[in-house]
Regions:
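A substrate-engagement module of RecA-like helicase motors
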Residues: 1-7, 40, 58-217, 227, ...
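Conserved helicase motor "Helicase C" RecA-like lobe of SF1/SF2 P-loop NTPases
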Residues: 497-522
Length: 668
């Protein structure tokens, strides 16, 4: 065992940081799971020093959600390498951002398909003596002739491979000399993600980084590499490791639940059924079940059209009624028989699509996955059957509502797992949500930033609770808070529970902010990036503005607003999810699981976390100064206030509108 200090790259520890690293080291040494709530400025990325000290030649995997978090760890490990030049690390981002091959469809399917055809061609040519595929005139000609929109071969993958004599007879495929050389270079001198494509210069970036990853101490990867079981198992097989030999670190762990439930949920739209019918038309002679499945589709369409009469935008549908309606007058006895036929048909369609360079997910595949998950939901209460009604029609969904089983499986299968975040508050509630009654080490650190650099207030006279939304006095006071806050110098952000509430108060407040540049978060994600860039660039020109955004939206999480980019944030309202029958069923599930605390864990805790994430955009370095405002009296309720970080509870100034004006007026 080595000392933490051996891998700690800084001259001194921040308050609480040494203790955090010792806790992480103990868990890494003994095995198990730890959850660490470490506010911005705690130096939580240095937890990697604990894992390095305890690794005993085992591989370390760091899972991150965004490229900015990836960059944080790349930077941290570069500092560690100054003390330990022998340390080797590499990153693996998703193929979507690494793949240089053009074409339509899903990048993972495209990769699978072109690798299959490329391997077959390369092996055939190798048997005829062409051991360096990238230099084989025949392969070069085939690449030149193929349809670039529907590729069957990947020149980047082909350049990554070569053949050598096998030990017994024939030849075997190995990484090309160029690939191995570049992999060694990227280990010796890490290449930033934005420069990777240029560095690879004709070689597959993913193959290159995978080759490098096999020979490194640390691999940084994105959430989907870890939480998608199929991708994780394939990845670990390629790395030549078993989970029990890997030390796992999960960053921004407050996001784990949403990512896992998203991966394990599946949707079906009305247009999927229309496309499925077209796909089945050409299958009747190729699969005996095609006709029988085709006769089921009108029943599915009828079921979805029946839901169009609903007055609810989202509601539960009964899977038993769904099953009876689909099977009625069909050739099937139960849903399992339909799924079996669909699986067979899907395999034929997918194989045929790949041969034609078509790599989109087919509607039949989506229908198969939906009905398979729906059948599973009958015996698993962690799944709800839900429909949503919008402008495009009805969408059916089998929704996972509990990430605990999958997360426990992932974390428990590794030698150890450390989950860190700046917003795992209260950490005991997150522990129960993620791991139930399992033994988990928890730690919550204080805020390491100077107290004098921040002002925290909470309003006691306003709310966005549904019962008060039509109250004119309440609405006027909320508008007054927004106006008072917006008059402060510097860039300000105001977050609302929903777009509807945002638009209401933007309409009321913006006309009074004549001397301020105002930016309103667009619903369209494509427009959000450029508008945000304009807002953040104001201070560099000696200007400032006010940003109206949604809690949990595009402008509230995973963004680093350092220095003068953001001087204050206000959260208007407690951003609870809309209450409907689906939400009530979710609450009932968690009450059954956790008793009275269940509603808090599944309903209130996510709202608190969205609020903390929004406020957390302001103070990113010890030198940053800012005002943090909770403009909602429900934050003063005992259960909600008690869930806020300790430093926030201690420093919070309770205000009405008059006191609020005085308090922020004296802030300098």
């Amino acid at each position: 065992m080595e000392s933490i200090d051996t891998y700690f790259p800084y001259s001194e520890y921040r308050p609480g940081q040494r203790h955090m690293l010792e806790v992480a080291a103990q868990v890494a040494r003994a095995g198990g799971i730890a959850m660490i709530d470490a506010p911005t400025g705690s130096g939580k990325s240095s937890v990697v020093a604990s894992l390095l000290a305890e690794r005993n030649k085992r591989k370390i995997v760091i899972a991150v959600r965004t490229v900015s978090q990836l960059t944080t760890f790349i930077r941290e490990l570069e500092l560690v390498r100054k003390k330990r030049p022998d340390l080797k690390s590499v990153y693996l981002v998703g193929k979507g951002s690494m793949c240089p091959l053009g074409g339509e469809g899903d990048v993972y399917r495209r990769c699978e398909g072109v690798k299959k055809f490329s391997n077959a061609l390369m092996r055939d040519r190798a048997d005829k003596g062409a051991l360096t595929p990238a230099k084989d005139p025949f392969i070069i000609q085939q690449i030149r002739l193929m349809d670039k929109e529907h590729p069957l071969l990947c020149p980047y993958y082909i350049a990554s491979k070569m053949f050598v004599p096998a030990e017994s007879m024939g030849v075997k495929m190995v990484p090309s000399t160029a690939l191995r050389t570049k992999a060694d270079r990227v280990i010796a001198s890490p290449v930033p993600p934005r420069e990777l494509a240029e560095f690879c210069a004709g070689i597959c970036p993913y193959e290159l980084m995978m080759q490098a990853a096999r020979n490194t101490d640390i691999v940084i990867l994105n959430y989907h590499h870890l939480f998608d079981r199929e991708i994780r198992e394939q990845l670990y097989a390629n790395l030549g490791v078993e989970p029990q030999d890997v030390l796992l670190l999960i960053d921004e762990a407050h996001n784990c639940g949403d990512v896992i439930t998203g991966i394990e949920s599946v949707e079906l739209e009305q247009r999927d059924l229309e496309q499925a019918a077209r796909e089945l038309t050409g299958m009747r002679k190729r699969h005996k079940g095609a006709d029988a499945v085709h006769h089921v589709l009108p029943r599915l369409t009828e079921f979805m059209k029946g839901l169009e009469n609903s007055q609810e935008a989202e509601d539960w549908f009964d899977p038993a009624i769904f099953n009876r309606m689909i099977i009625k007058e069909s050739l099937y006895k139960n849903m399992d028989e339909i799924v079996d036929d669909l699986i067979g048909i899907s395999e034929v369609i997918r194989e045929n699509s790949q041969k034609n360079g078509q790599f989109r997910e087919t509607a039949i595949e989506r229908l198969t996955e939906f009905l398979f998950r729906l059948a599973q939901s009958a015996t698993d209460t962690a799944f709800l059957t839900v429909y949503q009604k919008n402008e495009t029609g009805i969408t059916l969904e089998v929704r996972n509502i509990d990430p605990a089983a999958s997360l426990s499986d992932v974390c428990g299968s590794h030698a150890c797992c450390i989950l860190i975040s700046g917003t795992l508050s209260p950490v005991e509630s997150f522990r129960r949500y993620y791991f139930g009654s399992a033994a988990v080490t928890t730690l919550a650190l204080p805020n390491a930033f100077p107290k004098e650099n921040r002002l925290v207030t909470c309003s006691n006279d306003i709310t966005t609770a549904y019962s008060m939304r039509q109250n004119k006095e309440n609405t006027t006071r909320i508008t007054d808070y927004i106006r008072a806050f917006s008059l402060l110098k510097g860039n300000r952000a105001i977050y609302f529970p929903s777009y509807q509430i945002l638009e209401t108060y933007a309409g009321l407040a913006v006309p009074h902010l004549r001397n301020r540049k105002v930016f309103i978060e667009p619903r369209d994600a494509g427009e959000a990036g450029s508008a945000l860039t304009q807002f953040l660039s104001l201070p560099s020109r000696g200007e400032s503005g006010v940003m109206f955004a949604v809690s949990g939206g595009k402008w509230s999480e995973g963004l680093d607003y350092r220095g003068e980019m953001l001087n204050g944030a206000m959260v208007v309202g407690l951003p609870l999810a809309p209450f409907n029958r689906v939400r009530r069923m979710l609450i009932e599930y968690y009450r059954h699981k956790f008793g009275d605390e269940g509603e808090f864990i599944c309903y209130t805790l996510p709202a608190i976390n969205r609020s903390l994430q929004a406020l957390g955009r302001v103070l990113r370095t010890p030198e940053d100064r800012g005002v943090l405002v909770l403009a909602e009296k429900r934050f003063l309720e005992k259960r909600v206030r008690g869930a806020l970080p300790g430093w926030m509870q201690d420093e919070m100034i309770e205000c009405d509108i008059t006191k609020f004006r005085d308090v922020i007026g004296s802030w300098k």
